[in-house]
Amino acid sequence: MRVKEQLLTLRAYVPGKNIEEVKREYGLSKIVKLASNENPFGCSARVTEALTSLASQYALYPDGHAFELRTQVAKHLGVKAEQLLFGSGLDEVIQMISRALLHEGTNVVMANPTFSQYHHHAVIEGAEVREVSLKDGIHDLDAMLQQVDDQTKIVWICNPNNPTGTYVEKQKLLSFLESVPKSALVIMDEAYYEYAGAEDYPQTLPLLEKYENLMVLRTFSKAYGLAAFRIGYAVGNTELIGQLEVARLPFNTSTVAQSVALAALEDQAFLQECVKKNEEGLHQYYAFCKEYNVFYYPSQTNFIFLKLGIPGNEAFERLMKKGYIVRSGAAFGIDDGIRITVGLKEENDEIIELLKELVNEQVQKEETYS
Protein backbone atom coordinates (compact mmCIF):
# COMPACT_ATOMS: atom_id res chain seq x y z
CA MET A 1 0.00 0.00 0.00
CA ARG A 2 1.41 3.39 -0.99
CA VAL A 3 0.55 6.85 0.25
CA LYS A 4 0.50 9.97 -1.93
CA GLU A 5 3.79 10.40 -3.78
CA GLN A 6 4.29 13.87 -2.29
CA LEU A 7 4.25 12.47 1.25
CA LEU A 8 7.38 10.50 0.45
CA THR A 9 9.28 13.78 0.03
CA LEU A 10 8.32 15.11 3.47
CA ARG A 11 9.40 14.52 7.05
CA ALA A 12 7.06 14.47 10.02
CA TYR A 13 7.26 17.65 12.09
CA VAL A 14 10.13 17.49 14.57
CA PRO A 15 9.47 19.64 17.67
CA GLY A 16 12.15 20.80 20.06
CA LYS A 17 13.44 18.12 22.44
CA ASN A 18 11.30 17.66 25.52
CA ILE A 19 12.60 18.02 29.06
CA GLU A 20 12.48 14.36 30.11
CA GLU A 21 14.27 13.28 26.94
CA VAL A 22 17.16 15.66 27.61
CA LYS A 23 17.37 14.65 31.26
CA ARG A 24 17.78 11.01 30.26
CA GLU A 25 20.24 11.70 27.46
CA TYR A 26 22.58 13.99 29.40
CA GLY A 27 22.06 12.83 32.97
CA LEU A 28 20.83 16.24 34.11
CA SER A 29 18.42 16.98 36.94
CA LYS A 30 17.52 20.55 35.93
CA ILE A 31 16.40 21.45 32.43
CA VAL A 32 15.21 24.82 31.14
CA LYS A 33 13.28 24.58 27.89
CA LEU A 34 13.61 27.69 25.76
CA ALA A 35 12.93 26.05 22.41
CA SER A 36 9.22 26.10 21.62
CA ASN A 37 8.16 29.69 22.36
CA GLU A 38 5.88 28.69 25.22
CA ASN A 39 4.85 31.20 27.87
CA PRO A 40 7.29 30.79 30.80
CA PHE A 41 4.77 32.41 33.13
CA GLY A 42 2.20 29.72 32.45
CA CYS A 43 -1.45 30.65 32.15
CA SER A 44 -4.03 32.62 34.08
CA ALA A 45 -5.18 31.27 37.45
CA ARG A 46 -8.69 31.42 36.01
CA VAL A 47 -7.74 28.51 33.77
CA THR A 48 -7.13 26.29 36.80
CA GLU A 49 -10.46 27.39 38.24
CA ALA A 50 -12.21 26.55 34.97
CA LEU A 51 -10.70 23.06 34.90
CA THR A 52 -12.16 22.13 38.29
CA SER A 53 -15.72 22.54 37.00
CA LEU A 54 -15.41 20.25 33.98
CA ALA A 55 -15.36 16.76 35.51
CA SER A 56 -19.07 16.16 34.91
CA GLN A 57 -18.68 16.83 31.18
CA TYR A 58 -15.92 14.35 30.28
CA ALA A 59 -18.31 11.76 28.82
CA LEU A 60 -20.08 14.29 26.60
CA TYR A 61 -19.15 15.50 23.14
CA PRO A 62 -18.03 19.14 23.02
CA ASP A 63 -19.99 21.95 21.41
CA GLY A 64 -18.82 21.53 17.82
CA HIS A 65 -19.62 25.16 17.06
CA ALA A 66 -17.80 26.46 20.18
CA PHE A 67 -20.71 28.86 20.72
CA GLU A 68 -19.65 30.51 23.99
CA LEU A 69 -16.01 30.88 23.03
CA ARG A 70 -16.99 32.06 19.56
CA THR A 71 -19.29 34.70 21.03
CA GLN A 72 -16.70 36.06 23.45
CA VAL A 73 -13.80 36.03 20.97
CA ALA A 74 -15.97 37.88 18.45
CA LYS A 75 -16.85 40.46 21.09
CA HIS A 76 -13.21 40.82 22.14
CA LEU A 77 -12.04 41.31 18.54
CA GLY A 78 -14.96 43.42 17.37
CA VAL A 79 -15.95 41.01 14.58
CA LYS A 80 -18.99 38.87 13.80
CA ALA A 81 -19.20 35.38 15.26
CA GLU A 82 -19.69 34.05 11.74
CA GLN A 83 -16.23 35.35 10.80
CA LEU A 84 -14.47 32.84 13.09
CA LEU A 85 -13.16 29.35 12.36
CA PHE A 86 -11.75 27.39 15.31
CA GLY A 87 -9.19 24.64 15.15
CA SER A 88 -7.10 22.35 17.33
CA GLY A 89 -4.27 24.87 17.33
CA LEU A 90 -3.32 26.90 14.28
CA ASP A 91 -1.75 23.75 12.86
CA GLU A 92 -5.21 22.37 12.20
CA VAL A 93 -6.48 25.69 10.87
CA ILE A 94 -3.59 25.76 8.39
CA GLN A 95 -4.39 22.17 7.43
CA MET A 96 -8.08 22.97 6.88
CA ILE A 97 -7.34 25.98 4.70
CA SER A 98 -4.78 24.07 2.64
CA ARG A 99 -7.10 21.12 2.20
CA ALA A 100 -9.96 23.35 1.06
CA LEU A 101 -8.04 25.58 -1.37
CA LEU A 102 -5.06 23.69 -2.75
CA HIS A 103 -4.65 20.97 -5.36
CA GLU A 104 -2.34 20.06 -8.19
CA GLY A 105 -1.93 22.98 -10.58
CA THR A 106 -2.25 25.63 -7.88
CA ASN A 107 0.56 27.35 -5.99
CA VAL A 108 1.28 29.11 -2.72
CA VAL A 109 3.71 31.96 -2.08
CA MET A 110 5.59 32.31 1.20
CA ALA A 111 8.80 33.56 2.74
CA ASN A 112 11.86 31.45 3.54
CA PRO A 113 12.47 30.80 6.35
CA THR A 114 9.05 30.96 7.94
CA PHE A 115 6.69 28.60 9.77
CA SER A 116 7.19 25.20 8.19
CA GLN A 117 3.59 23.99 8.15
CA TYR A 118 2.58 26.26 5.25
CA HIS A 119 5.04 24.42 3.02
CA HIS A 120 4.22 21.03 4.52
CA HIS A 121 0.49 21.12 3.81
CA ALA A 122 0.89 22.69 0.39
CA VAL A 123 3.07 19.77 -0.67
CA ILE A 124 0.59 17.24 0.74
CA GLU A 125 -2.18 18.79 -1.37
CA GLY A 126 -0.03 18.69 -4.50
CA ALA A 127 0.41 22.46 -4.85
CA GLU A 128 3.58 24.18 -6.03
CA VAL A 129 5.46 26.04 -3.30
CA ARG A 130 7.07 29.35 -4.27
CA GLU A 131 9.45 30.54 -1.58
CA VAL A 132 11.00 33.99 -1.44
CA SER A 133 14.05 34.63 0.73
CA LEU A 134 13.69 37.10 3.57
CA LYS A 135 15.29 40.49 3.01
CA ASP A 136 17.22 41.58 6.10
CA GLY A 137 15.20 39.01 8.02
CA ILE A 138 11.85 40.45 6.88
CA HIS A 139 9.27 39.32 4.32
CA ASP A 140 10.18 40.78 0.92
CA LEU A 141 6.64 41.63 -0.19
CA ASP A 142 7.74 43.14 -3.49
CA ALA A 143 9.54 39.95 -4.47
CA MET A 144 6.66 37.84 -3.19
CA LEU A 145 4.23 39.82 -5.33
CA GLN A 146 6.29 38.95 -8.39
CA GLN A 147 5.69 35.26 -7.66
CA VAL A 148 1.89 35.60 -7.57
CA ASP A 149 -0.06 34.57 -10.67
CA ASP A 150 -3.55 33.41 -11.62
CA GLN A 151 -2.94 30.00 -10.03
CA THR A 152 -1.82 31.39 -6.67
CA LYS A 153 -4.39 30.37 -4.07
CA ILE A 154 -2.63 31.47 -0.87
CA VAL A 155 0.02 34.00 0.11
CA TRP A 156 1.30 33.23 3.61
CA ILE A 157 2.65 36.11 5.71
CA CYS A 158 3.82 35.15 9.19
CA ASN A 159 3.69 38.45 11.06
CA PRO A 160 5.66 38.58 13.30
CA ASN A 161 7.73 35.97 11.53
CA ASN A 162 8.86 32.69 13.02
CA PRO A 163 11.85 32.13 13.35
CA THR A 164 13.22 35.68 12.99
CA GLY A 165 10.75 37.62 15.15
CA THR A 166 10.63 40.41 12.58
CA TYR A 167 7.51 42.06 11.18
CA VAL A 168 6.01 43.60 8.06
CA GLU A 169 5.26 47.30 8.45
CA LYS A 170 1.72 48.64 8.02
CA GLN A 171 2.33 50.71 4.88
CA LYS A 172 4.16 47.88 3.12
CA LEU A 173 1.31 45.51 3.88
CA LEU A 174 -1.31 48.00 2.64
CA SER A 175 0.61 48.49 -0.59
CA PHE A 176 0.81 44.73 -1.04
CA LEU A 177 -2.92 44.24 -0.42
CA GLU A 178 -3.71 46.90 -3.02
CA SER A 179 -1.53 45.15 -5.60
CA VAL A 180 -2.13 41.44 -5.07
CA PRO A 181 -4.85 39.80 -7.21
CA LYS A 182 -8.17 39.36 -5.40
CA SER A 183 -8.13 35.68 -6.41
CA ALA A 184 -5.23 35.04 -4.01
CA LEU A 185 -6.03 34.67 -0.31
CA VAL A 186 -3.57 36.65 1.81
CA ILE A 187 -3.24 34.98 5.20
CA MET A 188 -1.66 36.88 8.07
CA ASP A 189 -0.47 34.36 10.65
CA GLU A 190 -0.43 36.43 13.83
CA ALA A 191 0.38 33.70 16.34
CA TYR A 192 2.58 36.18 18.23
CA TYR A 193 0.24 39.16 17.81
CA GLU A 194 -0.09 39.90 21.53
CA TYR A 195 3.67 40.47 21.82
CA ALA A 196 3.92 42.86 18.86
CA GLY A 197 4.23 46.41 20.16
CA ALA A 198 5.82 48.32 17.27
CA GLU A 199 3.93 51.49 16.37
CA ASP A 200 3.84 50.58 12.68
CA TYR A 201 2.81 46.97 13.26
CA PRO A 202 -0.36 46.55 11.14
CA GLN A 203 -3.73 46.12 12.82
CA THR A 204 -5.30 43.76 10.33
CA LEU A 205 -8.79 43.10 11.68
CA PRO A 206 -10.13 46.52 10.57
CA LEU A 207 -8.83 45.71 7.07
CA LEU A 208 -11.03 42.63 6.67
CA GLU A 209 -14.04 44.64 5.52
CA LYS A 210 -12.11 46.27 2.68
CA TYR A 211 -10.05 43.26 1.61
CA GLU A 212 -12.24 40.18 1.24
CA ASN A 213 -9.17 38.16 0.25
CA LEU A 214 -7.54 38.80 3.64
CA MET A 215 -7.60 36.34 6.53
CA VAL A 216 -6.03 36.58 10.00
CA LEU A 217 -4.88 33.68 12.20
CA ARG A 218 -4.41 33.87 15.97
CA THR A 219 -3.87 31.39 18.78
CA PHE A 220 -4.19 30.78 22.51
CA SER A 221 -0.94 28.77 22.54
CA LYS A 222 1.59 31.58 22.91
CA ALA A 223 0.88 34.66 25.03
CA TYR A 224 -2.18 33.09 26.66
CA GLY A 225 -0.07 30.10 27.75
CA LEU A 226 -2.43 27.35 26.57
CA ALA A 227 -0.18 25.38 24.22
CA ALA A 228 -1.17 22.04 25.79
CA PHE A 229 -4.86 22.59 25.03
CA ARG A 230 -4.49 23.23 21.28
CA ILE A 231 -6.85 25.98 20.23
CA GLY A 232 -6.45 28.64 17.56
CA TYR A 233 -8.69 30.40 15.08
CA ALA A 234 -9.03 32.18 11.77
CA VAL A 235 -10.87 35.45 11.15
CA GLY A 236 -12.10 36.17 7.64
CA ASN A 237 -15.06 37.09 5.49
CA THR A 238 -18.20 35.18 6.39
CA GLU A 239 -18.65 33.50 3.01
CA LEU A 240 -15.18 31.97 2.95
CA ILE A 241 -15.29 31.00 6.62
CA GLY A 242 -18.60 29.25 5.98
CA GLN A 243 -17.06 27.30 3.13
CA LEU A 244 -14.06 26.32 5.26
CA GLU A 245 -16.38 25.02 7.98
CA VAL A 246 -17.11 22.10 5.63
CA ALA A 247 -13.47 21.00 5.99
CA ARG A 248 -13.59 21.17 9.80
CA LEU A 249 -14.00 17.96 11.79
CA PRO A 250 -17.31 17.89 13.72
CA PHE A 251 -15.84 18.07 17.25
CA ASN A 252 -12.35 19.39 16.57
CA THR A 253 -11.95 21.52 19.72
CA SER A 254 -12.56 19.86 23.07
CA THR A 255 -14.80 21.07 25.87
CA VAL A 256 -11.67 21.51 27.99
CA ALA A 257 -9.90 23.60 25.34
CA GLN A 258 -12.92 25.82 24.79
CA SER A 259 -13.43 26.36 28.52
CA VAL A 260 -9.83 27.24 29.34
CA ALA A 261 -9.56 29.54 26.32
CA LEU A 262 -12.65 31.39 27.49
CA ALA A 263 -11.18 31.71 30.99
CA ALA A 264 -7.85 32.95 29.64
CA LEU A 265 -9.55 35.49 27.39
CA GLU A 266 -11.32 36.98 30.38
CA ASP A 267 -8.03 37.68 32.20
CA GLN A 268 -6.46 40.39 30.06
CA ALA A 269 -4.55 41.73 33.08
CA PHE A 270 -2.54 38.50 33.26
CA LEU A 271 -1.90 38.65 29.52
CA GLN A 272 -0.60 42.20 29.69
CA GLU A 273 1.68 41.35 32.61
CA CYS A 274 3.17 38.50 30.57
CA VAL A 275 3.74 40.83 27.63
CA LYS A 276 5.43 43.38 29.91
CA LYS A 277 7.77 40.79 31.44
CA ASN A 278 8.55 39.41 28.00
CA GLU A 279 9.62 42.86 26.81
CA GLU A 280 11.91 43.15 29.83
CA GLY A 281 13.37 39.75 28.98
CA LEU A 282 14.04 40.75 25.39
CA HIS A 283 16.00 43.75 26.63
CA GLN A 284 18.20 41.42 28.67
CA TYR A 285 19.20 39.74 25.41
CA TYR A 286 19.54 43.03 23.54
CA ALA A 287 21.97 44.31 26.18
CA PHE A 288 24.07 41.15 25.88
CA CYS A 289 24.11 41.27 22.09
CA LYS A 290 25.17 44.91 22.01
CA GLU A 291 27.89 44.44 24.62
CA TYR A 292 29.33 41.35 22.90
CA ASN A 293 28.75 42.48 19.32
CA VAL A 294 26.40 39.58 18.61
CA PHE A 295 24.07 39.84 15.63
CA TYR A 296 20.36 39.64 16.44
CA TYR A 297 17.00 40.49 14.94
CA PRO A 298 14.95 42.95 17.03
CA SER A 299 11.94 40.87 18.01
CA GLN A 300 8.19 41.48 18.17
CA THR A 301 7.67 38.05 19.72
CA ASN A 302 8.60 36.02 22.80
CA PHE A 303 11.81 34.73 21.23
CA ILE A 304 15.01 36.11 19.78
CA PHE A 305 17.10 34.89 16.86
CA LEU A 306 20.82 35.58 17.14
CA LYS A 307 24.17 34.53 15.68
CA LEU A 308 27.10 33.76 17.98
CA GLY A 309 29.74 33.25 15.31
CA ILE A 310 29.62 29.46 15.63
CA PRO A 311 27.38 26.86 13.94
CA GLY A 312 23.87 26.78 15.36
CA ASN A 313 24.04 23.02 15.90
CA GLU A 314 27.20 23.42 17.96
CA ALA A 315 25.65 26.13 20.12
CA PHE A 316 22.52 24.00 20.50
CA GLU A 317 24.47 20.95 21.69
CA ARG A 318 26.70 22.86 24.08
CA LEU A 319 23.81 24.70 25.67
CA MET A 320 21.83 21.48 25.99
CA LYS A 321 24.69 19.81 27.84
CA LYS A 322 24.36 22.65 30.36
CA GLY A 323 20.62 22.04 30.69
CA TYR A 324 19.26 24.66 28.29
CA ILE A 325 17.18 23.60 25.28
CA VAL A 326 17.07 26.08 22.39
CA ARG A 327 16.46 25.68 18.65
CA SER A 328 19.32 25.52 16.19
CA GLY A 329 18.95 27.80 13.20
CA ALA A 330 19.84 24.81 11.05
CA ALA A 331 16.25 23.64 11.54
CA PHE A 332 15.20 26.72 9.57
CA GLY A 333 18.01 26.78 7.04
CA ILE A 334 20.10 29.37 8.92
CA ASP A 335 23.09 27.29 9.95
CA ASP A 336 24.88 29.97 11.97
CA GLY A 337 21.99 31.02 14.21
CA ILE A 338 19.94 29.93 17.20
CA ARG A 339 16.43 30.81 18.35
CA ILE A 340 15.89 31.28 22.07
CA THR A 341 12.53 31.64 23.80
CA VAL A 342 12.46 34.45 26.35
CA GLY A 343 12.22 32.81 29.77
CA LEU A 344 11.95 33.94 33.37
CA LYS A 345 14.42 36.67 34.36
CA GLU A 346 16.72 34.25 36.17
CA GLU A 347 16.61 31.81 33.24
CA ASN A 348 17.57 34.59 30.85
CA ASP A 349 20.41 35.64 33.15
CA GLU A 350 21.74 32.08 33.37
CA ILE A 351 21.69 31.30 29.65
CA ILE A 352 23.16 34.70 28.80
CA GLU A 353 26.16 33.82 30.97
CA LEU A 354 26.54 30.62 28.94
CA LEU A 355 26.24 32.59 25.71
CA LYS A 356 29.01 34.90 26.90
CA GLU A 357 31.25 31.87 27.43
CA LEU A 358 30.58 30.65 23.89
CA VAL A 359 31.33 34.06 22.40
CA ASN A 360 34.51 34.51 24.44
CA GLU A 361 35.77 31.07 23.43
CA GLN A 362 35.18 31.88 19.78
CA VAL A 363 37.01 35.20 20.11
CA GLN A 364 39.98 33.44 21.71
CA LYS A 365 40.07 30.88 18.88
CA GLU A 366 40.03 33.62 16.26
CA GLU A 367 42.85 35.47 18.04
CA THR A 368 44.89 32.26 18.22
CA TYR A 369 44.62 31.68 14.47
CA SER A 370 45.13 35.32 13.48
Curated annotation (Swiss-Prot):
Q: Which keywords does UniProt give here?
A: Amino-acid biosynthesis, Aminotransferase, Histidine biosynthesis, Pyridoxal phosphate, Transferase
SUPFAM superfamilies hit by this protein? PLP-dependent transferases
Q: Which cofactor does it need?
A: pyridoxal 5'-phosphate
Concerning InterPro entries, the annotation shows: Aminotrans_II_pyridoxalP_BS, Aminotransferase_I/II_large, HisP_aminotrans, HistidinolP_aminotransfase, PyrdxlP-dep_Trfase, PyrdxlP-dep_Trfase_major, PyrdxlP-dep_Trfase_small
Enzyme Commission number, as recorded = 2.6.1.9
Reactions performed catalytically: L-histidinol phosphate + 2-oxoglutarate = 3-(imidazol-4-yl)-2-oxopropyl phosphate + L-glutamate
The family classification in the record reads:
Belongs to the class-II pyridoxal-phosphate-dependent aminotransferase family. Histidinol-phosphate aminotransferase subfamily.
**UniProt protein name:** Histidinol-phosphate aminotransferase 1
List the source organism: Bacillus anthracis
Gene name as annotated: hisC1
